Amino acid sequence: LNMNNEKARFVWFPLLIAVAIAGGILIGRFFSAETSFGKTARYDKIESLLQCIEQQYVDTVNRNDLIENVVPKVIGELDPHSAYIPAKDLESVNEELEGSFSGIGIQFNILNDTINVVSVISGGPSEKVGILAGDRIISVNDSAFVGKNISNEKVMKNLRGPKGTTVKLEILRKTAKNPLFYEVTRGDIPVNSVDAAYMLDDKSGYIKISKFGKTTYDEFITALSKLHNQGAENFIIDLRGNSGGLMDAAINMANEFLPANRLIVYAEGKAFEREDAVSNGTGTFQKEQVVVLTDEWSASASEIFAGAIQDNDRGLIIGRRTFGKGLVQQQIPFRDGSAIRLTVARYYTPSGRCIQKEYQLGKSEDYSMDIVNRYMHGEFFNADSIKQNKELVFHTVNGREVYGGGGIMPDIFVPRDTTGVTSYFNNVANEGLLYQYAFDYTDKYRDELSTAKDVESLLSILEPNTLLNSFVQYAAQKGIRPRPVYINISRKLIVNTLQAYIARNILGEEAFYKLLLRDDETLQKARDIVNKGEGYPELPAENQVPR
């Protein structure tokens, strides 16, 4: 397949970078200095207040501390996604979407107050010097790095750093009698967003996307090409749990499936003139069946992609209603290195739907409870429980009715699967024991497990009964008493989860999803639909537009 890697040329936010983040859709991450805060012709009550306090208040106070306390409160009176980002946090907040960062190239966890190397990134700095999965880091730059004060934030702060700088590590390894010492030169570490891409059968390919970052589109094209070369004629794109990221990644992805001159998304606001993103016709996969999987945590850029596919009648959305996050934000820097992300517009799907759900100014706590309320109302389990405003009706290009009011409603609803979920399973899952046991098991039997080169050979080692009985004993030692009836009900779920975690430790993310999703009802529904050739929406007889 001759893949077209040239990114689509869109009529879209000229000179600005469009980004979807946890706070909504962000534009202008590197906004010009002229827009930063500085001079103002208006009377500034806050500035006058600060001067008054500095000059006349009985005690000495720190002006910067006062400002750092006041600004978040002001922003908190706006919508739930406008945000203030202190200077100390801005770099790490931006880093998630950059596609890479400078570090040593390991994945780690903290168990028993110790940093455990879960995996070493192939080709990364740590692999080059000989660090292995299962190693324990006990000191960094000659300073002890164990104990209850160790946190993920502290580890990342010390292991990450400018490219080309070095960090000294002291390592414990089970096969070594004495500690090992390494000096690692930091390098660029990719932040991958396509977690898995594999064939479900002879004709259907599956792609799991966890976020939308700077490299997502290129990763997506690579995944599509790989699956197409393996015979894929249908594509199932899993956006469940994907809270968003870079908007242009979602736009370019949608462009791959759409003919020319199709609206993908547009944005508009009070002081923000409407801007459209339109497909350019260079997409390579304009005819194949496409199904998009969504759930209540699919948000922002995920909703842009799903909305473009749905409103253009290009494919089906299967799963549950999405989050409903559709605010466009502009990042405006302060001179001290901090910034605000201010909502300036809303984005709309091609049919004109605003995906943003309702909110009240200054009521972020109520807003954050929406997911809980949806759960309690039964929306995750019954399509009839979903609240839809029938007055906000819109139409796809071929005349199908779709509704606004918040989120993307799936074409085919699949309830949350509760098969095998018991109080025992919830207890061991909430305590993190499934993950911890899988790591300990991997560490104990790493040599034997490492002989497995694929999922099938790994499963031949992981005998279900032995694994389950061993885990129940482990959980009992951690304070979760055995409950035979519930354990039997949750048996398959526990074993599948343990095998998936162990597979991740040995074979990586793709193996993890292959095992975790073996019995996934939403994925199975999508697979059945495309295998029957029913991956296109049922269209009204009149006013059909050619795909």
Describe these PLM feature segments.
Residues L1-R9:
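Short, Lys/Arg-rich N-terminal segment immediately upstream of the first membrane anchor
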Residues W12-R29:
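Hydrophobic membrane-insertion alpha-helices, especially the h-region
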Residues I27-R42, I46, L50-V58, N62-R63, ...:
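Cleft-lining beta-strand/loop regions that shape enzyme active-site pockets
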Residues Y57-V118, G164-A196, L517-R527, G535-E542:
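Extended, small/polar residue-biased N-terminal targeting/export presequences
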Residues G134-R136:
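Structural motif
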Residues V140-N141, L172, E358, G405:
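Residue-level recognition of conserved beta-strand edge/terminus positions
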Residues A301, D313, R320, G324-L392:
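Polar, glycine-rich mid-to-C-terminal structural blocks
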Residues C354-I355, Y359-R547:
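Conserved functional hotspot residues or short segments at active or partner-binding sites
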